[in-house]
Each structure stands twice: as structure tokens, then as C-alpha cells.
């Protein structure tokens, strides 16, 4: 068998119906859309409506809730801090504060604070002051000979 000899099984495909092509076609004039109304117009669909079938958002159970006073933190990884210090965008001699991280472009916005995580290689001796940090990030900074000061531990949790 060759590629050009391949074909669909009989009845597997159906010829496309061209609608709105005159009354003799059986799908002319209204084109199967009925008379007037929202559903006869083009590009209109009622979102979430599944033709009377119970919609997906109602079939699934309600779960969880949104915390009303949720804190959103900007996340910074130690590996990126290391790269910015090596590139000269952050001053490794001075304490690295949240304002310094924003000024360097490492973080776009502080949001409710900055949280440091331990992803990446880190071996610089730095003093970092941030709102929150993971335990592994604190260990990594202290192992390198620096210090990581968490200014607001309650907010970071």
C-alpha cells in the first residue's frame, strides 16, 4: 500500500452543506437559524449555556474560598540576586533592601513585600533585608557567610 492509495472508509466523511444558497437547497434564507432573536445573529453565544444541559460550572462542586486579606509577595530567587551582584546591578557591599531590588530592576513592584526563595546557585556573602524568606533561603545565605534578615515574619507566612 502506498500513501496515495489511502482513503477514508465509505460513510466516514460527509459532504459539507453550504447554507443560505436559496430555497431549493433546503438550507436557504434563514440558514437553519430560525427567525430573528439573539441566536440568529452572527457571533453571538451565551457563555456557559449548554443548551439546557446542566452547565459545567454547576456540575462541579463548590470548593475553597478567596482569602479577603491575602498578601501578595513579589518572589525573588537567590540565584538571580547572585547574577545581579556579579553583573554590578546590585551593590554587594551594602545591605540589599527591598528598595534596592526594585531600583535594580530585579523586582518590578514590591506588592505587599518581597519574599526570597532558595532556587539557583548562591555563594555570595551578602546582607539581605526582605519581608519574607523560605527556611532554605535563610540557610543558603548563612552558609555563604551572609545574613538574611526578615523584617516582617508575620506578614510573610
UniProtKB/Swiss-Prot annotation:
Residues 21-35 have a biased composition (Gly residues). Keywords: Ribonucleoprotein, Ribosomal protein, RNA-binding, rRNA-binding. The keyword rRNA-binding applies. SUPFAM superfamilies: Ribosomal proteins L15p and L18e (SSF52080). GO terms for cellular component: cytosolic large ribosomal subunit. One of its GO terms (molecular function) is rRNA binding. InterPro entries: Ribosomal_uL15, Ribosomal_uL15/eL18, Ribosomal_uL15/eL18_sf, Ribosomal_uL15_bac-type. The keyword rRNA-binding applies. Belongs to the universal ribosomal protein uL15 family. Binds to the 23S rRNA. Part of the 50S ribosomal subunit. HAMAP family: Ribosomal_uL15. PANTHER family: 50S RIBOSOMAL PROTEIN L15 (PTHR12934), LARGE RIBOSOMAL SUBUNIT PROTEIN UL15M (PTHR12934:SF11). This is Large ribosomal subunit protein uL15.
Amino acid at each position: 500500500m502506498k500513501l496515495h492509495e489511502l482513503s477514508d472508509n465509505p460513510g466516514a466523511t460527509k459532504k459539507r452543506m453550504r447554507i443560505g444558497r436559496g430555497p431549493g437547497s433546503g438550507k436557504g434564507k434563514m440558514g437553519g437559524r430560525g427567525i430573528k432573536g439573539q441566536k440568529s445573529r452572527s457571533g453571538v453565544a451565551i457563555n456557559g449555556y449548554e443548551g439546557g444541559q446542566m452547565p459545567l460550572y454547576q456540575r462541579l462542586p463548590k470548593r475553597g474560598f478567596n482569602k479577603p486579606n491575602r498578601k501578595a509577595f513579589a518572589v525573588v530567587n537567590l540565584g538571580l540576586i547572585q547574577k545581579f551582584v556579579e553583573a554590578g546591578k546590585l551593590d554587594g557591599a551594602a545591605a540589599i533592601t527591598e528598595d534596592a531590588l526594585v531600583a535594580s530592576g530585579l523586582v518590578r513592584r514590591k506588592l505587599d513585600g518581597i519574599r526570597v526563595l532558595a532556587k539557583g546557585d548562591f555563594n555570595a556573602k551578602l546582607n539581605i533585608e526582605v519581608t519574607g524568606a523560605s527556611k532554605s533561603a535563610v540557610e543558603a545565605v548563612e552558609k555563604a557567610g551572609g545574613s538574611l534578615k526578615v523584617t516582617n515574619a508575620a506578614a510573610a507566612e
